[in-house]
A protein has these predicted regions:
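Metal-associated gating/positioning segment near the N- to mid-region
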Residues: 2-62, 84
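Short acidic/His/Gly/Ser-rich catalytic and metal-binding motifs that mark active-site loops
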Residues: 11-15, 80-83, 120-125
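The substrate-binding groove and active-site-proximal loops of carbohydrate-active enzymes
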Residues: 24, 86-93
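Charged, low-complexity surface patches
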Residues: 28, 53, 94, 132-135
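Divalent metal-dependent hydrolysis catalytic cores, especially in the metallo-beta-lactamase
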Residues: 31-58, 68-79, 110-124
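Alpha-helix-loop-beta-strand connector modules within alpha/beta enzyme cores
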Residues: 60-77, 130-142
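Histidine/acidic residue-rich metal-binding segments in metalloenzymes
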Residues: 97-116, 121-142
Length: 142
């Protein structure tokens, strides 16, 4: 079995703004099916999506069995408001909002929870993130 363990069916791999604009307000089943078919042709039978706030990953999860693909997704990534993640995830500012997002993810059919704890790695500077990560206490509490 071959797997890809960090995909976002929503994104194209080149222009994230254009990729996001290509879906809402309606999901593009043709595009999702083309991508699932490409994975199938490459012999990949397991995909783990990082999720998105538009529902593309959930639709892909519904379609994936037609291609012999096991598809797992968190439904949407969860991030702290004011930090990295607003372009693709759902945000929280307090524990009550966080718990509500957990319940919504579960009701949506999430297979796991993705909590965004930092920005991106800065590939031009070893060990540097693009923004301050959540504190250890915040990660522990949430």
């Amino acid at each position: 079995m071959f797997a890809d363990l960090h995909i976002h069916m929503l994104l194209s791999g080149s222009d994230c703004k254009a990729a996001i604009a290509g879906h809402p307000p309606h999901l593009d089943d043709i595009l999702i099916k083309e991508r699932l078919s490409a994975y199938q042709s490459a012999g990949i039978s397991y995909l783990r999506d990082g999720g998105d706030r538009f529902g593309v990953c959930l639709r892909a999860k519904e379609l994936a069995p037609e291609y012999g693909i096991t598809y797992r997704t968190p439904a949407f990534p969860i991030y702290k408001k004011g930090h990295y993640g607003s372009f693709i995830g759902r945000g929280w500012s307090d524990f009550a909002e966080y718990r509500a997002l957990l319940a919504e993810a579960q009701a949506s059919g999430a297979d796991f929870i993705k909590l965004m704890v930092s920005g991106l790695m800065d590939f031009s500077a070893y060990g540097v993130l693009t923004e301050e990560p959540l504190t250890g206490a915040e990660v522990h509490d949430f």
